[in-house]
A protein has these predicted regions:
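Residue-level signal for secondary-structure boundary sites
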Residues: 59-60, 98, 180, 221
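Alpha-helical scaffold segments that mediate packing/assembly in large oligomeric complexes
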Residues: 93-164
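Protruding loop/beta-arch "assembly-hinge" segments enriched in small, turn-prone residues
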Residues: 1-34, 38, 204-207, 220, ...
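Short acidic, glycine/tyrosine-flanked loop/strand segments centered on an H-E-D-like triad
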Residues: 76-99
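Signature of extracytoplasmic/envelope-associated structural regions
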Residues: 4-10, 22, 45-46, 64, ...
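Broad gene-expression machinery/nucleic-acid interaction feature
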Residues: 46-48, 87, 165, 169, ...
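N-terminal "assembly arms/tails" that initiate or stabilize quaternary assembly
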Residues: 1-81
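Extended oligomerization regions of viral-like shell subunits
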Residues: 53, 155-247
Length: 260
């Protein structure tokens, strides 16, 4: 008969491995869908959302002697947006569902929703990447003047001005450049309470020329260590919701002993 002290190493076969906790990998919140106009495509109204935009009319000066015979034509243009469908599929065998930790199963349940929200944000960023005007240069840190310039290009645009609110969406690394610009004097001269002190203590969350700044880590950093940022009026972009989010379960008894 063996003798000695009983330790966990001696009784390793009797120890169970228990999942104490589980968590999903953290993701960035969907930023862009929250900052644009959102409309719903009504049921039984076709595949596309359609809006009619009318061009400006011209008025003219007259006198008391004027016999006005210059009718203006209305010029209409159709803006058509067709929503794209997004879907995700998972399959869990009955054996997996029976034997997996309930803590793990609870986390797995929300991953599909996270993926859908991330896809919406990435699609929004792709659309914004088609913006017509580019400010700044490759390899050069952004300055707050670029954001102010973009803001006034929007609100004073000669073709059609954009109205407030105006948002700026940037990668956090780019927002750090804004922080550096505003906090550059710290250590060189006294910093009284104000914008600089506020940013130094709480991070860069100030508006710039009425542009609200938002961090979105889903923005891609390219091979030059650059990340694009976007400044836009809310009404410039329309997110059309077609089918509402839904979940469905289909039994597959012939796969792996059954699953869904």
């Amino acid at each position: 008969m063996a003798t000695g002290r009983n330790t966990t190493g001696v009784l390793a076969d009797s120890l169970d491995t228990i999942v104490a906790s589980a968590r999903a990998r953290r993701e960035y919140e969907a930023v862009v869908p929250q900052l644009v106009d959102r409309v719903d495509l009504s049921p039984h109204s076709g595949l596309s959302w359609k809006e009619i935009m009318f061009a400006k009319l011209s008025a003219q000066a007259i006198t008391e002697q004027t016999v006005l015979d210059n009718p203006q034509l209305f010029d209409d243009t159709a803006i058509t947006i067709t929503p794209q469908m997004v879907q995700i599929q998972t399959f869990i065998t009955d054996k997996t569902g029976r034997n997996l930790s309930t803590k793990s199963l609870a986390q797995m349940g929300k991953l599909a929703g996270n993926a859908m929200m991330r896809k919406r944000d990435e699609d929004g960023l792709t659309a914004l990447d088609g913006s017509t005007t580019q400010l700044g240069t490759i390899g050069t840190p952004i300055v707050t003047g670029d954001i102010a310039a973009a803001r006034y290009r929007i609100t004073s645009n000669a073709t059609e001005p954009g109205n407030l609110p105006i948002s700026g969406v940037f990668h956090g690394y780019v927002i750090k450049d804004m922080y550096d610009e505003l906090a550059a004097g710290i250590g060189s001269y006294p910093v009284p309470e104000g914008a600089t002190a506020q940013v130094f203590k709480g991070g860069f969350n100030l508006p710039i020329a009425q542009v609200s700044i938002h961090e979105d880590g889903n923005i891609t950093i390219d091979s030059n260590a650059d990340a694009k940022g976007f400044v836009f009026a809310k009404e410039a972009w329309v997110l059309v919701n077609g089918m509402t989010l839904k979940t469905e379960t289909r039994r597959e008894p012939h796969i792996g002993g059954g699953g869904e």
